[in-house]
Each structure stands twice: as C-alpha cells, then as structure tokens.
Amino acid sequence: QNARLVMNAEEYYRTMFQGRVSSWNLRDRHMADTLEALDAHLTGRAGKSAKIVVWEHNSHLGDARATEVADMGEWNVGQLTREHWGRRAVRLIGFSTYHGTVTAASGWDEPPQTKRVNPGLPHSYEDVFHQTGLSHFYLDLRQPGSLAAEALREGRLQRAIGVVYLPRTERQSHYFFARLSDQFDAMIHIDETHAVGPLERGGAAGDEPPETYPSGL
C-alpha cells in the first residue's frame, strides 16, 4: 500500500498541471483502489466477505454517471465501486439539507468558518424535499415500483458543499444537474442542518510549501 501511495502521489502532482478533471479522477481512483485493497485484506483475514462503511462528500460518493460531470469525463468513488462490486453489493447513501449552517472555508488553505447555508434553489432536489414539510427523513430509492424513485429520476439541480462554501456564487460554485435515483441508492434529508465543531481545538498549521512546489517543474 505504501508503494501504491507513492506511485499515485507522484502521478497526482503531475496531473495537477493538466487540469481539474485529470487530478480529480486520479484521486478518486486511488481512493477506490485503496478500498479494494482493504476489502481484499479484511476478507482474506476473516475468511468471509468484509462489510465496509466509507464516509465521503456526496460529490465523491454519488455515481458520477448520473450527473453532468460525466460529460466532462469525470468519475468518482461511487461509480468505481458500483463497477467493481456491482449494484447489489454497494449502497450509496447521500445527504441533503435545505438550509441551516455549515462549517466550511472561503478558499483552500483558509480557516474554517460557520457559514449560513442559503435556502435550496427553487425546483432543486433540496427544494423538493423541503416541500414535504418533514424535518428529516430517510428515502429508499431501490424499492421496486417506487413512485418516489421514478419521480426523482428526473434531472434536477443538486447542491454540493465541501471544504469550501461560497454562498454569493452558489449556483455557479455548488450546483449541478443530477438524476438522483440513478446517483444514489438512498437519501437522508435534514431540512435544517447545524455546523459541526471539532472535539478538540488544535493549533494552526505551520507554513507549508504549496502542493505544486517547486513551481518551476
């Protein structure tokens, strides 16, 4: 695994100069490869199929083929795990919220802040879930003949908030079109979310060279 990490890290830094899609794909491929190696190790040690839970942002977890990023040639962990193990063995569960607060930064390498999340855009998946009037719910999208699953297969805007959140440019920065029922196997919706906080306050990170240092290479 250490050798695989060194090899993929070296290739990752090369692809950073080629564009976002190349570096994104390599990073998610590495995460999927690591998951496959972990599964093989745990299965071999226990003598039976392993069960693994992975916690990721929706943009890494929801099957990229069901979103507009697939048109740019982008894939992710959710797609790769379905392709490797098959849909019967994988459960992709997404999270969504309509409004509230979130812990995020205004830019990479900037300190975290508690930010107010804008209400979901009209006709987005977040807005549709808000219109139910429920404060929270779990929605199984794999039920045969489910009317909800069929209705949510229609392409709609979906919000993705990660390390960075930019409320002023939210439509351009955080929304993309998706087909929810093809993207996820289930959804957990929390209508009003609350920002997470660290269990322990750590010190500020020291000065580090940029990822692409030395920039002349």
Regions found by a protein language model. Give the residues of each.
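A charged, amphipathic alpha-helical module
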Residues: 1-51, 58
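Loop/turn elements at helix/coil->beta-strand transitions in domains of secreted/extracellular proteins
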Residues: 48-52, 87-90
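C-terminal regions of proteins
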Residues: 62-217
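Structural motif
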Residues: 53-55, 188
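Short beta-strand segments
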Residues: 55-56, 94
